[in-house]
Amino acid sequence: MSQEQPRRPREPVKYGDVFEVSGELADKPIAPEDAKMMQSAETHVFGHTQKGGPAAVMQSAATTNIRGGFVHPDDKTELVAERGATVEQTVPAATVTTEFVGGQVVGQHVEPRRVVAAARTDEEALQSTITIGEALEATVKTAGNKPVDQSDAAAIQAAEMRASGTNVIALAGVAASAQSAADHNATVDRDERKIKLRDVLTGAAGKLSADRAVTREDAEGVVSAEMRNNPKLCTHPGGVAASLTVAARLNERVDI
């Protein structure tokens, strides 16, 4: 009795299958050279590749694509070759690591730094916290090139309402701009013509009618809003919900 041969997958594993990315990159099969680029980037920053991180995910997908005959061992994605696969670390109060492929965020995590300091005054503690407006502005650095969609608009609306303490959305506020951008983008096919998060969130803190430090409850509310309005029921890596979550974690380490 002959052993049944394993079936080949009918389609390659694409970036959009494993990462929350959009546009041209989402439809591209993950190629072996792409995975090597991310492995190199992670090794340069961490000294090794991250278990379960973007590089590991990409390597697994690339191996599957080779076995399926969709790519060759030396294939690379032109878009990734042009824009690169990089790892960036930002935010002085913590190590916030953001990983990019082809200019889009594929992973982000935060490691708060241990700080041993003398007791601070209440005013000094308040000044060291991150506000909702500042967290929204931080999204420009991690996902500024992302076209605004309904999940972004919902997350921004939730953030603005929590900052103001009311359910009223200001006509000229950040949330109204985000909703307008999402509605516009829904009618546009090409990403380069869509309104991006950077267009909406640059200077967000100054556009809010009120602002305050981000709490865990704020972050959870924004995460819930973003997930509910995403067809995949997930948040965008480095997006609005992720930024609020990072800010809340950092604020919890400040003794106010």
Swiss-Prot record:
Residues 1-20 are annotated as: Disordered. Keywords: Cytoplasm, Nucleus, Repeat. Disulfide bonds: none annotated. LEA proteins are late embryonic proteins abundant in higher plant seed embryos. The function of those proteins is not known. Belongs to the LEA type SMP family. It comes from Arabidopsis thaliana. Its main location: cytoplasm. PANTHER family: LATE EMBRYOGENESIS ABUNDANT PROTEIN 31-RELATED (PTHR31174:SF7), SEED MATURATION FAMILY PROTEIN (PTHR31174). It holds the Pfam family SMP. This is Late embryogenesis abundant protein 32.
